[in-house]
A protein has these predicted regions:
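Glycan-processing catalytic domains of CAZymes
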Residues: 1-173
Length: 173
């Protein structure tokens, strides 16, 4: 839709986001992703609840035709020794440049409890770090977004799919 669903969300208290990085059968172009970020930001600033869920593993493009309603099932799944921290930092940074008071985030390796699911019933250490309130909205410079919080500086480059979070330790009294 021309407004990316902002008019439709008025009928609800919020929205559940998945397919955030995909468009049709392909990984979203940087322009489409930038537009999605802008829409998320607008809805979140207007007070809508936004729940964003994203997959940690790569898209499995070797499967040919995919069922676009099953994006979780078309991911490769994390390998036994695969380090997913780089991807988690990217996804969490992407979320943080958009998030407001009623925004929620889940990064997963599928919605199953198989023994090969590396993140089932785990909690990333980043979730326990103090973030604090945002110092303002994200600043966009091309395809790079930055945002500061009381205890973190976030930078995400959607063109290169790189996210960085610099954690700032709170001062002790």
């Amino acid at each position: 839709t021309p407004d990316n669903g902002l008019e439709a969300i008025k009928q609800f208290d919020g929205s559940y986001l998945e397919h955030f990085e995909t468009f049709g059968e392909k990984v979203a172009s940087r322009n489409y992703l930038a537009q999605s970020i802008e829409t998320f930001q607008k809805a979140a600033r207007e007070g809508y609840m936004i729940a964003m869920t994203v997959g940690l593993s790569e898209m499995n493009t070797a499967d040919g035709e995919r069922n676009l309603h099953k994006t979780d099932e078309i991911r490769k799944g994390l390998g036994a020794n695969e380090d997913y921290n780089k991807r988690l930092n990217y996804l969490l940074s992407l979320f943080l440049v958009c998030a407001e008071k009623h925004s929620y985030f889940l990064a997963h390796d599928g919605y199953h409890a198989h023994k090969n699911n590396k993140v089932w019933m785990t909690r990333p250490a980043e979730f326990d770090r103090p973030l604090g309130p945002p110092k303002g909205p994200a600043v966009q410079d091309g395809y790079i977004y930055t945002r500061e919080f009381a205890h973190a500086k976030v930078r995400v480059d959607i063109d290169n799919q790189v996210g960085e979070i610099e954690w700032i330790e709170p001062e002790k009294n």
